[in-house]
Amino acid sequence: MIDGKKRKEEKRIKDEDLFKVVDSTIDSRTYLSLIQIARRLNIKEYYGAISSGKEAKIYPALTRDGKWYAVKIYYVSTAASKRALEKYTLGDPRFKDVKIKTTFQLIEIWARKEYKNLARLSEAGVSAPKPIYVFRNILVMEFIGEEGVRAPLLKEVPEEAITEELYNAIITEVEKMVNLAHLVHGDLSEYNIMVWDNRPYIIDVSQSVDIEHPNALELLQRDLENINRFFEGHGVNVEPVEDILGRLEISNVKGNDVYNSSG
Ligand code: ATP
Ligand code: MN
């Protein structure tokens, strides 16, 4: 009885009360999805966007029992993004049966893909946000930071915190990502790593591919070069990319041998 009454009362709460900040960029379909997600995950409030990239926006959300989530909303945008989506999803064995129709369906695949990739990272013990829920074009994950204030990106970390220890910790996460989760990030840089309590968190894995993907080695090489370039630029002694690759179990058609003999 009391439970039923309480539930009715909760439904009576005006939907607008869910949103701390009015965001006119949220379309009505996404808005309704956010309301459904709030009911499902016991979310009390969504806060203003902490980031608006080209293809996604991130909002902090607070549950009634005081947990913070990061809510990533993917947007249907340009033809370029459609091409990128196709490039990464085609060739990925997990998506070979998916018949691609509309850009909206693509964006939903994109959200599910990031969810699955985060789940693989989490299972393999890689430091990354834990996935919580995915619905349509919206992904809910663990919030990296405190009280709705996000952790800094590697790009934003103060100079004195950019150390060899941090570099090694990041390379260790990349190794776990490849050897245990069998994933290559594909867009790794100082913009897609957060640092919290001196610990790196790998984020933005929607485009990450299985190590069997035809471009996996090429992407991994570029990821490592980005990390090395960043730390070298801050005076940290880095390990040559080919040495790191030597420890990574990524032997596809193109293979490590080809890389090693040319490098
Ligand atoms: P952008 O183009 O802005 O990089 P994106 O589509 O690449 O957007 P992400 O990189 O996943 O999306 O997230 C955008 C930003 O949101 C990140 O740079 C980071 O500041 C913040 N962010 C992402 N995930 C989380 C999280 N789990 N917890 C806290 N903040 C996060
Ligand atoms: Mn990003």
Give each language-model segment a name:
Residues 1-8, 24:
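N-terminal targeting/trafficking signals and adjacent low-complexity tails
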Residues 33, 37, 157, 230, ...:
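Residues that form generic nucleotide/phosphate-binding pockets
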Residues 75, 145, 190, 195, ...:
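Short, glycine/acidic-enriched loop or turn micro-motifs at the edges of active sites
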Residues 165-166, 179-185, 196-263:
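C-lobe/activation-segment region of protein kinase-like
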